Every structure is written in C-alpha cells, then in structure tokens.
From Swiss-Prot:
InterPro entries: PAPS_reduct_dom, Rossmann-like_a/b/a_fold, SO4_adenylTrfase_ssu, Sulfate_adenylyltrnsfr_sub2. It comes from the Bacteria. This is Sulfate adenylyltransferase subunit 2. GO terms for biological process: hydrogen sulfide biosynthetic process; sulfate assimilation. The lineage of its organism: Bacteria, Pseudomonadati, Pseudomonadota, Gammaproteobacteria, Enterobacterales. It comes from Escherichia coli O6:K15:H31 (strain 536 / UPEC).
C-alpha cells in the first residue's frame, strides 16, 4: 500500500486495522472494551473492517457502573444485536452490594470500585491477555505518553517508566504468565479525526453527541443532564431545559454537557475547528485529584 497516496484518515485507518489484526494473531484471548462512546464506535467499525466478511474473533466487554445514560444502554444493545457481536457485560457485584454511587461516595471511589476494580474482575474472570481500548493520546497528558501496546503486570498495573519501544510499527507483545496488555489502536487519532471519520464512514453514534434541548442543572461549574430520578436537588438548584450536547460520555452524574447548537456531524466538525478546550473537561473523574488519570491507570484503569 502506497502511504503517500492515502489521505491522513486512510493512513490512520490502515494503522489501526494493522494493530487490531496484529493483536488478534498474536494473543490467545483478546477482548475489545466497549464503552459505547464515539471512540468505541470507531474502534468497533475498524475491527469489523479488519475481519470483513467474517465476524469479530473476539467479544466486546462493557464494564457497567449502572450509571450510564439510558440512551447509551439502548445503543449498546442495539449495536451488538445489529452486528452479531458477542457482548459481555460485567458489573462489580461487591460495589452493587455496597450501594456505591457517585453522589454518596464521590467520583474517585465510584470510579475505583465500579470501573477499575470491575474491569480487573472481568479480565481475570475470562482470562483475557489483551484488551483493546479507545483511548487517544490527544485526550489527556498521561495518555499522551502511553504506548500503543500498554503492558500491565499480573495485578493489571501500569508502570509509565517501564514501557517498550515501538519502532516502525513493530510491536513487542511478549508477556509472561499472568501479565496482559491494553492496546490502543486509536492512539494517533485526534478528536477532529474521529468526527471526520464518523462522517466519512457514516458510523452510528449515541444521539447524546448531537445538540438538543435537555433537562440540565448547573452544579460545581458543570452542566449535569438529569437522566433519572436518582438525584437529590440541593438548595437553590433548578432543572432547566437547555440546548446542549456531549463531547464525551460516561456516568451521567460525572459527565458535563456543553452548550451547543451543533445538531449535525458537519456542524460538530465545524465547532471542533474553533474549540480551545479539551473534550474531557466535562469528566469529573479526570480532576478529582492531582494526577488523577495517571494514578487510576497505575491502579489498573484502562
């Protein structure tokens, strides 16, 4: 393939497909982490392209916290059924028994128990030795220094000082028993690339990414969309309908909306061209403590 003749999106596509095929061939029991967001949708689309006309040679895994938007759950089930994917859903039973939730226990504890520990439980339960994730280097500074093949010890911990070189698209996947890797095929993509590719390939996404009138309240400088009745309003708080959309999706109490009128993909792309803020500015888990994301990744977060 002549790389010089490819557009930058086709070059990124080819690189990602190469990585996905490499992992499928090299590891005995891979899995694709499916968080239902735009990056997961692109990664799933690339995986389907990589093995077309066959089916995916690995399952999808959703680590469920019980606090995703209802539209995300509907989209997840519809997508898995439409594409004939094997979908595994894991929810930390200990966290459920303890009644862990972001309002009572805070974002750090909720994320640690329901997401990090839940993910490690699922990986151990099924014995996966490689897990695809949709993280990109432009999202956050700790992800910017992480390799495409991110090695984890037998406790799923990441050591940023112990990473392997990746020269000329050559990846060293050798691991010892009990170790595993997290693989990030979208590492070199940007948010703008993701949106342009979604438009180019007509990839289905959760409607929450498109602007619409939604019930929100402002709390701690964040526009929180009220998705169900599990919220207790604080004195002076009022729920109002506002024109908002989401740049990133997660647990609804921890994911801030942004005011926007972008109701189509071209309008989102145009909006991104002038944006000066990170898409993850609305994610509470990224700023609940100093060096938050790197600390979470060292503990086993994806």
């Amino acid at each position: 393939m002549d790389q010089k003749r490819l557009t930058h999106l086709r070059q990124l596509e080819a690189e990602s497909i190469h990585i996905i095929r490499e992992v499928a061939a090299e590891f005995s029991n891979p899995v694709m982490l499916y968080s239902i967001g735009k990056d997961s949708s692109v990664m799933l689309h690339l995986a389907r392209k990589a093995f077309y006309p066959g089916t995916l040679p690995f399952p999808l895994l959703h680590v469920d916290t019980g606090w995703k938007f209802r539209e995300m759950y509907e989209f997840r089930d519809r997508t898995a059924k439409a594409y004939g994917c094997e979908l595994l859903v894991h929810k930390n039973p200990e966290g459920v028994a303890m009644g862990i939730n972001p309002f009572v226990h805070g974002s750090a504890k909720h994320t640690d128990i329901m997401k990090t520990e839940g993910l490690k439980q699922a990986l151990n339960k099924y014995g996966f030795d490689a897990a695809f994730g949709g993280a990109r280097r432009d999202e956050e500074k700790s992800r910017a220094k992480e390799r495409i093949y991110s090695f984890r010890d037998r406790f799923h911990r990441w050591d940023p000082k112990n990473q392997r070189p990746e020269l000329w698209h050559n990846y060293n996947g050798q691991i010892n028993k009990g170790e595993s890797i997290r693989v990030f095929p979208l590492s070199n993509w940007t948010e703008q690339d993701i949106w342009q590719y979604i438009w180019l390939e007509n990839i289905d996404i959760v409607p929450l990414y498109l602007a619409a009138e939604r019930p929100v309240l402002e709390r701690d400088g964040m526009l929180m969309m009220i998705d169900d009745n599990r919220i207790n309003l604080q004195p002076g708080e009022v729920i109002k309908k506002r024109m908002v959309r989401f740049r990133t999706l997660g647990c609804w109490p921890l994911t801030g909306a942004v005011e926007s009128n972008a109701q189509t993909l071209p309008e989102i792309i145009e909006e991104m061209l002038v944006s000066t803020t990170s898409e993850r500015q609305g994610r509470v888990i990224d700023r609940d403590q100093a060096g938050s994301m790197e600390l979470k990744k060292r503990q086993g977060y994806f």
